Amino acid sequence: MTAHRPEPLTEPLIPMPALTPEALRAAVEKLTPSRVPAFVQDLVEATTSTQQNQSLAPLRTFVHTWGVFVAIQRRPPLAARLRHLEEVVGAGTEDPTEAMAEIRAIHAAAEAEAGL
């Protein structure tokens, strides 16, 4: 496997939404409707934890996680590449070093794109 630099691969399907739960939910609904239940569950858990701990850290983590997810999912070929790399690492049949490096690069590019 050759390490690849993450590239946009295609124009995004939708613009990058604001990093708010409402905007991220709308993006998840458009891009990956099957993930809406997980999004809602994560939001409920983050909100509950924020209230219980009187800390915004859980909500920040939620926005970061789903902001990166949306940034990647906006480009289906990039999302497919990430899934492939995760499968390579999960299979354990190859040295995962290059795949892990590319996964990190994809996530770093998505964080930058999302403004995180």
Could you describe each region identified by the protein language model?
Residues 79-116:
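Amphipathic alpha-helical binding modules
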Residues 34-74:
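Amphipathic alpha-helical interaction modules
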Residues 22, 34-37, 57-60, 76, ...:
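Generic alpha-helical secondary structure signal
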